[in-house]
């Protein structure tokens, strides 16, 4: 059993449009480069928070910019001015058919999603009538509000007051395979929201919907705010993932943030919840202080996606990247000789792109540790190469079905 592995998923941090991006309406998307260029133009200054060019010295030192240049071919930075990266660096291409959170995470853990998710059409009353009527009946509701594609923050501003007055939850979707339910934590009840989400999870299975998401909020009309009590009710992966194999082998699999939800709580030995990227980083550091040899610490940093990518907040995304970057030395200080850290993403969500949806992009693949030398691993043809490499390092008895190790 060799060392430990820590995986940091920078949710939505793509580094260049995939070759098939046009099929998804995402030709030209590049989350990193477009944020970098916006900062360079002075468009991401926030009084008292950040100013000027994007500053990611630690990620750059691990090969982020080298990987991004290889991914897109865009000469957005002079690589000759940078030091040789201190770790493995490259980029990966998604084989799954979607550009969503479960697809990216499952593929990373060795299970590409080769089937088509179900989606709801972008029109008024977008959900099947039988689904909504059965949902109302089984949940004993007076009705529902919304029933359309919408931004989660906008729809609670639009319908939150009516929701409180009528007791009708707000149901909506997006370009992802999701059925989302928003409700006020106090007026409707947080546990009640979770209960109706569980009912919805069973009802949407026949439509091949990837996730039911509880979207609780608080506040009063004009100042509603989503809380950190979100829960994702995902359909289980179709095959065993890296997490399952590790758990079966007696390893600790410590899921931080929404990781456990993404894998439908399968293959997880410990769940740690935290709200916000910095709290998630704190939880990761705490886990690494006590995680035993042979274990996996797996964290999803959701704010990049939910707070900045979807909301097309370029300056906020830039600031979040810099906050993440400055914490990396704290993690490095906790690494034992045989530990490895993997940094990746699950899809893109270019905040400069039209709309509010994910973008089909390559992801960065960065790996470092006390005994890891510098190496360009090039283009990886499947996110599962990450999982296969983790399996090899942790000396699992048998390799994953998908993916090629780059160790």
Swiss-Prot record:
Its cofactor is Mn(2+). Mn(2+) 2 binds at residues 305, 310, 358. GO terms for biological process: 2-deoxyribose 1-phosphate catabolic process; 5-phosphoribose 1-diphosphate biosynthetic process; metabolic compound salvage; nucleotide metabolic process. It is found in: Cytoplasm. Gene3D superfamilies: Alkaline Phosphatase, subunit A, Phosphopentomutase. It is an enzyme of class 5 (isomerase). Mn(2+) 1 binds at residues 11, 346-347. InterPro entries: Alkaline_phosphatase_core_sf (IPR017850), DeoB (IPR010045), Metalloenzyme (IPR006124), Phosphopentomutase_DeoB_cap_sf (IPR024052). GO terms for molecular function: magnesium ion binding; manganese ion binding; phosphopentomutase activity. One of its GO terms (cellular component) is cytosol. Binds 2 manganese ions. Keywords: Cytoplasm, Isomerase, Manganese, Metal-binding. NCBIfam families: deoB (TIGR01696), PRK05362.1 (NF003766). Isomerase that catalyzes the conversion of deoxy-ribose 1-phosphate (dRib-1-P) and ribose 1-phosphate (Rib-1-P) to deoxy-ribose 5-phosphate (dRib-5-P) and ribose 5-phosphate (Rib-5-P), respectively. Belongs to the phosphopentomutase family. This is Phosphopentomutase. It comes from Legionella pneumophila (strain Paris).
